[in-house]
Amino acid sequence: MSSETFEFQAEISQLLSLIINTVYSNKEIFLRELISNFSDALDKIRYKALSDPSKLESDKDLRIDITPDKENKTLTIRDTGIGMTKADLVNNLGTIARSGTKQFMEALTAGADISMIGQFGVGFYSAYLVADKVTVISKSNDDEQYIWESNAGGTFKVTQDDDGRAIGRGTKMILHLKDEQTEYLNESKIKEVVKKQSEFIFYPIYLHVLKENEKEVPDEDAEEVKDEGDDKAPKVEEVDEDEEDKTKAKKTKKIKENKIEEEELNKTKPIWTRNPADITQEEYASFYKTNDWEDHLAVKHFSVEGQLEFRAILFVPKRAPFDLFETKKTKNNIKLYVRRVFITDDATDLIPEWLSFIKGVVDSEDLPLGLSRETLQQNKIMKVIKNIVKKTLELFNEIAEDREQFDKFYSAFSKNIKLGVHEDAQNRPALAKLLRYNSTKSGDETTSLTDYVTRMPEHHKTIYYITGESLKAVQKSPFLDTLKEKNFEVLFLVDPNDEYAMTQLKEFDGKKLVDITKDFELEETEEEKKDREAEEKEYEGLAKSLENILGDKVEKVVVSHKLIGSPCAIRTGQFGWSANMERIMKAQALRDTSMSSRRSSRPTEGNDRTVKSITQLLFETSLLVSGFTIEEPSGFAGRIHKLVSLGLNIDEDAETSEEKEADTVVAEAPADSDMEEVD
């Protein structure tokens, strides 16, 4: 047999080194990860056999077998699944790193639990937690039988298995256990781990144990001894024939015999087929943890009857997966079965992208068994299955009844809820009820839009909100002044996804949603309106002068009653970008620059130099307090220095070149500047 030696991909070598050289107490998770991989292999061959039954000819018994060997210190696990070709062994077990390899190493370095390894797609390597050498023998219907082996020293060997015992189809994995890990050869330990972590695996798991039994056999030696004694002391005695047979039958002895016995470790039927009333929370947790390393946050177990019959169990995890929003991520959180036969874990129509964190099982009685992935997406019955979204929303509302649980949920999955508000028009009103924000009246707690509406004055028709980079920044915004004075509540939106969601939501419970950093009409009394119009007329000349000085930096300058503590502020137009959105778009490398084009410079003339400088300074400070950035910080600094000089009565007969530049330079305007106003 000729062997080929390959080097592990660099990231995989680093991962193996990390696993081998770091001390972890929870090593038993290796068995869960390997059994999960074997179960996936069985799913794949079962699915292929739906369209081509001949795929199972080499072995129709789909199962997982575990065999401990104390004498040789090996633990063997095998399946009758799809098996691996030579290329599969080379690529999947060494030369091509999974997308999660790097992320998992970073998580481990940061102190994450080793139990998370399966969530990053690298569960196979958990074998090296307990083994110093791993041998994999695999046979695919599409190739010869091959052996993969490595002691994780940076390389692995792949050999065609011409001399070994044919395994038919599937994969056999032999773990050569470290001296300190031989407890995993004990029958009781294996049973304990499988029951705790893999009890609800769909396929039977058999444990093969060598047991010593006592057996009664005829004792030939005893009969010979008795005959010799009879010769020495002959005695004539008539014995009944039946009695003689009985005497001979007692001439036996007990011997010890070693025999391998098998025992099924997971006899429990699929949990989703049982009555929810008969299932304990511990059983749900055990089922969930066959594919995760920690408990779930919430579960929904239900059945649907009528046009389509199906059962489903849906789980909300405790935390978001590392690759939640990766565009190329394989969606494998919901497994679809038809009459307990696994069909696919990639039914993209089964659940919307914003719910991709939901895990579970859907088992239909009505879909055809031979359904392919392609026809699955076209089949109109799948549209009916989408009512699982409604059940999921019910689950979210149940979580919301417990403040502590909902806080955990919202912390992990608020981005998904906001994505749903943005993308799912049909369920947008229901999702909006799940949104939570801090506000001017909520203190340290968050508030829902529903609670906001209940606190609104009867005549009030608007829900006000402000967007910004942080809670601290928006709490000190000058835009809040008048609204606070009028006792109007304002929501604080500080997540980049908030503004996207609000632009789609537009209103809630018949109340219009308004961003106070943009141009809007403030509710006012007739007397307030009269005072505002009088002041606008009085300061019309000043506003016009400021417009002339600022030129194309602004659309217009207006007298505002929306400010109290600040002399001025920058607002964008109703349909333009807010300061927060401009900041977000600037951070995107491939942003659309057409919306943030700047106006060309326009020189100003005929104005007093000091007035111009102070006006520029007011404009720039307004940019800062309104959440924008200053494009020419050196010019801003020059104007500050000049203002300090004036305050100290320092004579400036001549301007420095920096000051001249500060007077004449025109800073770039914020996004969507054609809709911009100065209050």
Swiss-Prot record:
Pfam families: HATPase_c, HSP90. Residues 216-250, 589-609, 654-679 are annotated as: Disordered. A motif (TPR repeat-binding) lies at residues 675-679. Its main location: cytoplasm. PROSITE patterns: HSP90 (PS00298). GO terms for cellular component: cytoplasm. Residues 217-228 have a biased composition (Acidic residues). ATP binds at residues 37, 79, 124, 373. SMART domains: HATPase_c. It is found in: Cytoplasm. CDD domains: HATPase_Hsp90-like. Transmembrane segments: none annotated. Keywords: ATP-binding, Chaperone, Cytoplasm, Nucleotide-binding, Stress response. InterPro entries: HATPase_C_sf, Heat_shock_protein_90_CS, HSP90_C, Hsp90_fam, Hsp90_N, Ribosomal_Su5_D2-typ_SF. GO terms for molecular function: ATP binding; ATP hydrolysis activity; ATP-dependent protein folding chaperone; unfolded protein binding. Belongs to the heat shock protein 90 family. HAMAP family: HSP90. Homodimer. The TPR repeat-binding motif mediates interaction with TPR repeat-containing proteins. Molecular chaperone that promotes the maturation, structural maintenance and proper regulation of specific target proteins involved for instance in cell cycle control and signal transduction. Undergoes a functional cycle that is linked to its ATPase activity. This cycle probably induces conformational changes in the client proteins, thereby causing their activation. Interacts dynamically with various co-chaperones that modulate its substrate recognition, ATPase cycle and chaperone function. This is Heat shock protein 82. It comes from Ajellomyces capsulatus (Darling's disease fungus). The gene is HSP82.
